[in-house]
Amino acid sequence: MENRWQVMIVWQVDRMKIRTWNSLVKHHMYISKRAAGWFYRHHYESRHPRVSSEVHIPLEEDSKLVIITYWGLHTGERDWHLGQGVSIEWRQKRYRTQVDPGLADQLIHLHYFDCFSDSAIRKAILGQRVSPRCNYQAGHNKVGSLQYLALTALITPKKIKPPLPSVRKLVEDRWNNPQKTRGHRGSHTMNGH
């Protein structure tokens, strides 16, 4: 019998970002309790040798978001692609599909964090409690409504420290956009080129 390959999207990530992500998840699971219901699986609890951690985020009664971090992958064409990666899956019973980081953040925002949204005016008219600020800015992928922009101009959003874990921040690629850093003038190694 021949080998059958299964292809999946794995975002190449710096290992320090993975450590930061895991620390933020654990902090908000155990200390701040903002990520109540999330489940963290260590590398020694997985049967797959390349899995370094898994974070299971329940969404509805039988669906969840699973963020899996890998180590020991083949390195990429650049020096900093050191064999670390992240995959993001949406699972419901036996069905699995991969999602992009923006959609993952939106799903987390939708199920876990209250926000002033388009329906806030209707809620206020009905006498329901309306939150004047958003606790999870990473869940927004576009400019908010005029009402939201007016409210944010009136009430400054409160910064949460440490920040809530964002999947988009975890997989963002800052390496391919050269950033100028302070250093000697004309130094090609310091200015990102």
From Swiss-Prot:
Chain intervals for the UniProt region annotation (RNA-binding): 76-115
InterPro entries: Vif
Subcellular location, principal: host cell
Region of interest called Membrane association, as start-end residue ranges on this chain: 172-173
Site (Cleavage in virion (by viral protease)): 151-152
Biological process according to GO: viral life cycle
Localization: Host cytoplasm; Host cell membrane; Virion
Ranges spanned by the short sequence motif BC-box-like motif, renumbered to the chain: 145-154
Chain ranges for the short sequence motif HCCH motif as given in the UniProt record: 109-140
GO cellular component, one term: membrane
Region (Interaction with host APOBEC3F and APOBEC3G): 54-73
Segments for region (SOCS box-like): 152-181
Protein role: Counteracts the innate antiviral activity of host APOBEC3F and APOBEC3G by promoting their ubiquitination and degradation. Acts as a substrate recognition component of an E3 ubiquitin-protein ligase complex: mechanistically, Vif hijacks a host cullin-5-RING E3 ubiquitin-protein ligase complex (ECS complex) and the transcription coactivator CBFB/CBF-beta to form an active E3 ubiquitin-protein ligase complex that targets APOBEC3G and APOBEC3F for polyubiquitination, leading to their degradation by the proteasome.
Additional information: Vif-defective viruses show catastrophic failure in reverse transcription due to APOBEC-induced mutations that initiate a DNA base repair pathway and compromise the structural integrity of the ssDNA. In the absence of Vif, the virion is morphologically abnormal.
Domain characteristics, as noted in the entry: The BC-like-box motif mediates the interaction with elongin BC complex.
Family according to the record: Belongs to the primate lentivirus group Vif protein family.
Name of the protein in its database record: Virion infectivity factor
Species of provenance: Human immunodeficiency virus type 1 group M subtype F2 (isolate MP257) (HIV-1)
